[in-house]
Amino acid sequence: IESEMLEYLTKRMIEGDITNQRSQTALLLLSQSNSQGLLAILNSHKGEISASVSKEVSDALKRSDADDLKRIKKGMGVELPSITSRQIAATVAGVRDILARENLNMVQSAQTAFLTQSIWAITQVNTGAMTTEKALHSAVRKLEGEGISLISYRNTKTGRQTVKNKVDVAIRRHIRTQILQDSMRRTEQILDDAGVELVEVSSHGGARPSHAEWEGRVYSRHGDKVIDGVKYKDFKTACKWGDVADGIGGANCRHSYSAYFPGMKR
């Protein structure tokens, strides 16, 4: 029976569908009796499992950079090529990282379900099929329907549990972070290719005080500069680039940025 379940699950995971009742029941039973065997399946077929979502990721990325390219064309009269295989590969690698995460302190069945729903939600948002909130609620409902209400994390070095979040909080962070990081990576590539120096950071109501200090402003990408008599602060310094806790693109950050040209309507 165990061998049959392993064979069945391997096939379903490679096909990218492990959400039906039989799959979840098999995952639960195997995670209780043979968690190492199940983990071995995930690892040995990681490339194939990832490949099942690669096309969806590729299609999503090809549609996600329309605003950046439009701004470049309007501001510089330059029409850049659409997203390349290199950028697509970078984001597919990001999705693979989700599958490979090791700091989720849950039985394998719960971990697999959480990662599956996270990837599904990210794909829905990137393809424009759903808004972030709608995708979030759908993913949360599916997980709660499977009895998963809490997501636990552990320190990968000590093995100790570090924090426990409600599933809606955890999956919201997971979805937003992945989408934002993909978007920022692509934006940086476009700005570099076009030689753009100035960027405008978005703003939104309810921003945390530390983010309100730098949101909605225009910055220079390469140090403090004076352009056409206007002083611009360094973007990465002002917006705390790379600060996971409190910088742009960090945890729970909803800010984005894009090309800016003097005189452009803000």
Predicted regions and their residues:
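General structural signal for secondary-structure boundaries
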Residues: N34, I49-V53, M130-A135, T162, ...
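Generic ordered-secondary-structure signal
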Residues: I1-L6, S23, L30, R160-V163, ...
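Acidic, glycine-rich two-metal-ion catalytic cores of nucleic acid-processing enzymes
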Residues: L150, N165-G263
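A charged, amphipathic alpha-helical module
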Residues: Q124-A170, H174, R185-Q189, D193-A194
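N-terminal leader/targeting and assembly helices and adjacent pre-domain segments
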Residues: I1-I148, G263-R266
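Arginine residue identity/basic-tract feature
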Residues: R12, R22, R63, R71, ...
